[in-house]
Design a protein with these regions (language model features):
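Short, basic, alpha-helical segments at the C-terminal edge of helix-turn-helix-like DNA-binding modules
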Residues: 66-76, 115-136
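Short, Lys/Arg-enriched anionic-surface-contact patches
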Residues: 9-20, 61-70
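An amphipathic alpha-helical interaction segment
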Residues: 1-8
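DNA-binding recognition helix and immediately preceding turn/loop
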Residues: 18-62, 82-93
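Short hydrophobic clusters on alpha-helical segments that form packing/core surfaces
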Residues: 22-26, 70-78, 105, 109, ...
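Extended, charge-rich intrinsically disordered regulatory tails
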Residues: 111, 127, 144-150
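Short, solvent-exposed alpha-helical "recognition" segments
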Residues: 56-65, 109-113, 125
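Sequence-specific DNA-binding recognition helix
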Residues: 81-119
Length: 150
């Protein structure tokens, strides 16, 4: 291999390692309303710009990764704690308030959290976009589809 190819391979490996480290921090800190890409970069001891570079080959940006984790937590809580009010779910999942959570949920899934809750309670089929990914299920999180079917 050429020196350039070896350097590119090492850079790809570093980016993958840093993305994995970032995802670990996101998993630990997503419930903190103040947590964002700036704090994530600081915790990883890199600049925000460098963190964005590490995510440039990933399917999501840094901020999208944080939002995706928060929304997955919202879905899970709606399904597992159906009587908890949406405001408290929003705060527990890292959103500043229920309005912010509702708008992000609706924009991401095409259905609001209250409608999602009603669909789950009525055992109405839920669009695939709202189901956990295989990666999330492999980490031991139950599939919302299984919860709805019960």
């Amino acid at each position: 291999r050429t020196a350039l190819a070896q350097t590119a391979g090492a850079a790809d490996g570093l980016a993958a390692t840093m993305r994995a480290a970032a995802m670990d921090v996101i998993e630990r800190r997503y419930t903190d309303v103040e947590f964002d890409a700036v704090q994530l970069a600081a915790e990883l001891h890199v600049s925000r710009r460098q963190l964005n570079r590490y995510f440039s080959g990933a399917p999501r940006t840094v901020q999208q990764a944080i939002l995706t984790r928060r929304l997955a937590a919202v879905r899970g809580m709606i399904l597992t704690v159906p009587h908890r009010d949406l405001e408290s779910i929003a705060r527990e999942c890292g959103f500043a308030d229920g309005g912010a959570m509702r708008s992000r949920f609706l924009r991401s899934f095409g259905i609001g959290p209250a409608a999602f809750r009603r669909a789950a309670a009525a055992a109405v089929p839920v669009p695939d976009a709202m189901l956990l990914t295989a990666e999330q299920t492999a980490r031991g999180r139950p599939s919302p589809a299984a919860t709805i079917a019960e």
